């Protein structure tokens, strides 16, 4: 060794030599590594080449050290990695035609680098963990082919509208920056190509609505920001988005339509936020959603219709929330759900049938809840899960398993019952399943005769290696594995677990009553028992209970425990299913469920009001009632269900609006309408009268009349309308002068002129009026002289014939008044009885239309028929008199003869004379039925046969029929007896018409209302002139002296002048 130079320590010299040698060794090794690449081109130092990768990472060299690379890149280099160096800037131009990817992660770059000509070919640029403060669009415009840009873990604070030039970028990662603001339109230049955006771990507190106008974006991540509220339409514009991740933001509220517009999204991750409720408002529009993860939130409730817009869910994670109950509608609509995680909540209530909609569910996780009762109570909580293969129930404080606990789980293969202190398992509890794996560990089993089956079942199904079960009772078997217990040791010497002896009973009560429910249980153990009452599977805390214990010695000593639940002043909120749970140290037992139903009698909120309305209008009746259960509303008309409006499809019932409509009201709709409210507690009704008003009209057209002098003229004015119109008559546009020859019938609808003379001819006007208007009609009466009468013959018996005709009319009136009055008394009596049976008519006044005078309100309701009209026959018009039927007068010889009537040509005769002359007259029937009847009645009947009685005021239309045309009665009246004695047998012709009194109106087509006749006071005398009727008088032109009949004095007087009524009109 050479001596050390003077002044230089030997140790220092040796150190320098070692460093030089190590560097030379490094250079030699590098050269050896680069030799393989030398054949294809030299690999620049200090990089490593693995074509197409040029790896220059982790060299910790500054930028000036890399200038030598500018022209030394291998020709096939496509990937360049400068990560983990100390690059603070880069302005080195590279020469490569194949470079596509550049990674410069974990450096100290402050801006986006430029690589010269190869920059335009780069498709991937990763600048992770640098100190770039902003995105410069000018720097990015040199990257026209760039598809992936990773700027995560920099110090970028905002994304501006000008941050990105128009480019075909597909992947953008801006996570772990300091971004607080996203300017509107900041991603617009990337909208045609961007597929993935990551903005995790930034400082954004809100997302402006419609900020993402990226129709092709498929994946968006916003995890670990500071977003608290998501507004509606925030993500509108992301039509192709498939996955959205927003974990750990502290989101407390998702407003309605928050995710609207995400029509193709399949995955939504919202874990570790502060959501409190799942509802359809913020799920609106997610029709393609398949995975929803909302674990680690504060969700307390699932709305009944929460899943209406996302019924394609296949996986739902609701674990680690604060759910306490699962209502019946919690999972409605999720028929495609395959995996459901409800673990680590506080569920204590599962409604019956809550899982019945999940027919496709395969995995259900309910670990670490409080649903022991679902297994212990045999409530069939899992009914409907026909496809379930895996059920996790660990950590639910389950103490016993009933034989019905797993009914419906035909496909179950994996059952996890770990961490439950199970004491008893009923035989055949797992018979409904096809278990391949059973996880069970318990040391609390009550090893009595009821558990003997379990040992053999575990062996037969090869589960003895996957379970860890041991006995706790009886004491001499405590701690022993059930697999080691002999079968003869499973005995039942007592019943330590409580047994229910008295179950609460189902009760139906009225609101306000007090209700008592009783539950009794017995146990052979001295272990104290306690009782808990549940309503609809939820524990009742603040209730009034009475508990007592006594010893029961019917089959050995036992402890009997009784609990009485008192419910005072029950209301509708008390309705439900009640159940008692008796518990001691050895387990719990559940009573049957008793249903409490609280009813309330219906009461009306709206009652129908009496209504008066015109024909053709719309009738509207309101009726609403409340009660519990809600009463059913129905309608009746006049105590029945026959609605003319319903048959004609004019009736409309609006149950939601409590309104009953009748369109285009008609007269037949008039009546009493009853609103019936009925529920299980009872029923009641309210009535309203519908009065239909109709303007006056002519039921039958008015017809002109032509009569022969001396005949009786009947002028018909058959009126219709509601209320019944009042009729007045005028003659020749002036007052009608009423004499003893003028009579009115059927409420002035018939004007009868007896012994018509030439002075009676003229224009007669019928004026009908009611509150709705007035109608007029004209009838022209023509009186012609008889061509066959001479003066001598007309003087014979003229006076007697006229007065006999008057007598006939009076007799008819009297007889019909009596018969009709009796009929109306009976009809009115039965109508009132019927109304009292089914109706309670409102007493309020009628509500009249504005155009109807108020005096109509005093006319009463339809339960009392109005004068002149009957409600029950409002649309029926009966005939006044039977037709003549072509009656032909017979002479004394049995052949056709002539009838003598009063004529004397009426030119110079005194029509009020007591003596009248007779002339022969051949009867010719007229076309009008009513005139035929009256004419034949007045002319054909012998005047000798009548017994005249004083007439009475009548209100019946039938009064125009003579008693001779009435059917004989079983009990003849005095009048009929006298008539039978006085009438000659020769006058009782077999052809005389026999018609009942009550058929008159029907045959004439007139309504029931009676006619009003002016009262006539007579002094009746009986006139008999036998043989006169069969004899034809000798009425020659020269003979003026004719036989005269015996004179009779008749005094006619009237209580009311019809002329007064006419003038008043």
Swiss-Prot record:
It is a single-pass type I membrane protein. GO terms for biological process: innervation; membrane protein ectodomain proteolysis; negative regulation of axon regeneration; negative regulation of membrane protein ectodomain proteolysis; positive regulation of protein localization to cell surface; protein localization to cell surface; regulation of neuron migration; regulation of platelet-derived growth factor receptor signaling pathway. Gene3D superfamilies: Immunoglobulins, Ribonuclease Inhibitor. Disulfide bonds join 519-580, 623-675, 717-766. The keyword Repeat applies. Coiled coil: none annotated. Residues 498-597, 602-691, 696-785 form the Ig-like C2-type domain. The modification Phosphotyrosine is found at residue 906. This is Leucine-rich repeats and immunoglobulin-like domains protein 2. It comes from Homo sapiens. The gene is LRIG2.
